[in-house]
Every structure is written in C-alpha cells, then in structure tokens.
C-alpha cells in the first residue's frame, strides 16, 4: 500500500495503512490508568500470537536496537563467551553491542550476500564448549539474506546449553519464526517494519531459560532492565513513560495481521518477494544473495552495474517517479540498491517500481531495461 505521495520501498520504515494513521490521532490517556492497562494487556496478548510463543513478551519504547541491547544486558555478564554470527551490517551491530558490554565475542563472519551455515556454528560450539550464548541476525536487512535460523537452533541445542539470542527486526511478522517451536530464548524486533507502524516501539520475547540467566547476569542495565518491565507488566503498566500513540497504532496493526492470518501474511510476503526477484533479474540485474533459496522475503538487494550511476538512479526514481528505494550500507554503499517489500505490501506496489525502472534506466544509459 503506497502513500499518496511516495511509494516507499525501503525495508523500514514501511508505509502506514489508513487504519493505523487514524489510530495515531487517538487522544492521550493516563499511562498509569485503567485505559492504558487494557491497551497494554491486549497488545501484549496479540503480540504473543505473532511471536508464536507462550513466553514473556515485552513492548519497549525504543528502536529495535534497544531490544537487541536489552537481549544482551539481561542475560550475560562481562567476560561471558558468546558466539556471534554476522554476514552484514546489522549482524555487525549485534556483535558490537555484545563487545561494548564486555562479552568475549567469538565471531563467525561470512561474505555479505552469503547465508550462514549451521555447521559453522556447530563447529564453533565444539571448539568453545563453555559458550554462554549464540547471537544471530535472522534476516540480514543490509544484504537481503535470511539465514537458516531453524537449522542454527538445532545445531546449538544438540551441542550445548547456550542461549539463543535472535535479531528478528526485519523478519518477525513477515517470515515464519515460531519462537517456541524453534527454541529461541530471546527474540527482538521493532515496530517500523512488518508491524506497519512508525518507529519507536521494540518487542522482545524472553524464555524461562533467559530468566534463569537474568538472575546471574551482571551487565549494567537500567532503562532496559526486563525485570522492571516484568514487574510493571503485572500491574498493567510499563516501568517508564510509553509512547501511547504508537500503542494505539500497534493495537490496530496487530488486529489487521491476525485477521489476515499469519500464515496468509507469510504467503503474501513470499509471493511478492518472488515477484520482485524475478522482475529484477528480467531487468538484467544480479541479486546480492548468492543462494536464492535463502533470499529474503522482506527485502531484495541488487547489484548495481558499473555503467549505472547509483546516486543518480536513486535520485531519479525518487524525484521523477516518486519511488523511494534504499541504498547499500557500509562496504556496499554505492554498490547495491534494495527494494523493501514487507508490511502491507502487495504485488501492485512492486509493479509500480518495475514500470518506473523501465522508464528511468534507459534515460541513464542502462540498455538491459
């Protein structure tokens, strides 16, 4: 669903459906009163359905990165050994958070565009039997690759008691991730991607094993102390002032997702993603994902040919066609562009992108379009 002005095709923030926009105009209420308690209880219960979990789920007023930081500081102590898997910009971010708080990080790095093999993690666990946690980015937004989280969870559980901490910021709600079914201990995500609301809320699940680790965790924490969040939730409150407007929007967005049915959401996302990849290849582009079976259902990353000026292409798509694409991050800056297809997206949104590219690319001297 594109906005009236732009077809926003970044992998977050994503376009806001009309019911969400309307919910954002709801009047303020007392965040310590019964009305907010009802809102918090309802959204938390619905969020558990999307997470596919019976574990605790908390809604934080923060970005998705806040949830990632929370996952580290609530389960680990300085000096704890952690296996961290990265094949992109956001995997690197998770690594840096763990390092910042003093974890001893054993890094598994893969080429950007490659999937992370569960066998690499299995071998690392065997080499480091005292590892306390494995951290992994499920869907790497910077490369358009979805890693084999199910296989990784199996590899971890069959070889250790390590906690499994998951960055699911650009996957949960769009790509299947049964938190309990796969045995994930802590899963973090954010509001501005699959959940179709503005940035500003973060969501995190916390298992019983994670709570056992919490009792021993010695990393400093205050705002992101999930013990405080749990005590407050039992009273129908949050420990700190919440973004009430985003809670209103979230309540509506969750209703939309659950009414469609999560399985139907996954099917729609997969279909749109397949159409996007097919269309990009038909235009003569090469996907960054080296294994298309692991290509993301929420964002497609595409190599930019040498003959194409990436900044001019992005500018023309926005200024002339009113379509906003995402560029590359870090070492991929200027080398790829990314098409976001998550949230309320339908195939017609991507058809607009493809038609616009067919008009813009020849003007820029790209002959394959």
Task: Identify what each model region corresponds to.
Residues 286-320:
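Conserved PLP-binding catalytic core of the aspartate aminotransferase-like
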Residues 54-83, 87, 91-95:
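Conserved beta-loop-alpha segment that forms the PLP phosphate-binding cup at the N-terminus of a helix
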């Amino acid at each position: 669903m594109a906005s009236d002005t732009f077809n926003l095709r970044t992998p977050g923030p994503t376009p806001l459906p009309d019911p969400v926009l309307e919910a954002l105009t709801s009047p303020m209420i007392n965040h310590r009163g019964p009305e907010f308690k009802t809102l918090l209880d309802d959204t938390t219960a619905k969020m558990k359905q999307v997470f596919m979990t019976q574990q605790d789920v908390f809604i934080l007023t923060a970005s998705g990165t806040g949830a990632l930081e929370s996952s580290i500081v609530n389960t680990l102590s300085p000096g704890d050994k952690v296996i961290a898997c990265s094949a992109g910009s956001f995997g690197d971010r998770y690594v840096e958070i763990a390092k910042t708080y003093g974890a001893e990080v054993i890094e598994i790095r893969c080429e950007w565009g490659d999937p992370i093999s569960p066998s690499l993690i299995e071998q690392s666990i065997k080499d480091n039997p005292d590892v306390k946690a494995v951290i992994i980015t499920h869907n790497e937004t910077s490369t358009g690759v979805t890693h084999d989280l199910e296989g990784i969870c199996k590899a971890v559980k069959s070889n250790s008691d390590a906690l499994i901490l998951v960055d699911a910021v650009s996957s949960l709600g769009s790509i299947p991730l049964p938190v309990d079914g796969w045995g994930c201990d802590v899963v973090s995500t954010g509001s501005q991607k699959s959940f179709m609301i503005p940035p500003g809320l973060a969501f995190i699940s916390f298992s019983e094993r994670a709570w056992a680790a919490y009792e021993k965790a010695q990393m400093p924490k205050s705002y992101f102390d999930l013990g405080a969040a749990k005590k407050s939730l039992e009273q129908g409150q949050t420990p700190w002032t919440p973004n009430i407007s985003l809670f209103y929007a979230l309540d509506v967005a969750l209703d939309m997702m659950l009414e469609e049915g999560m399985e139907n959401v996954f099917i729609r996302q997969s279909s749109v993603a397949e159409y996007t990849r097919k269309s990009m290849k038909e235009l003569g582009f090469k996907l960054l994902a080296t294994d298309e079976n692991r290509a993301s259902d929420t964002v497609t990353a595409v190599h930019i040919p040498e003959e194409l000026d990436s900044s001019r292409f992005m500018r023309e798509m926005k200024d002339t066609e009113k379509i906003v694409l995402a560029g590359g991050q870090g070492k991929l800056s200027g080398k790829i562009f990314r098409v976001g297809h998550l949230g309320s997206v339908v195939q017609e949104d991507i058809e607009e992108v493809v038609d616009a590219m067919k008009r813009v690319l020849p003007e820029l001297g790209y002959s394959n379009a």
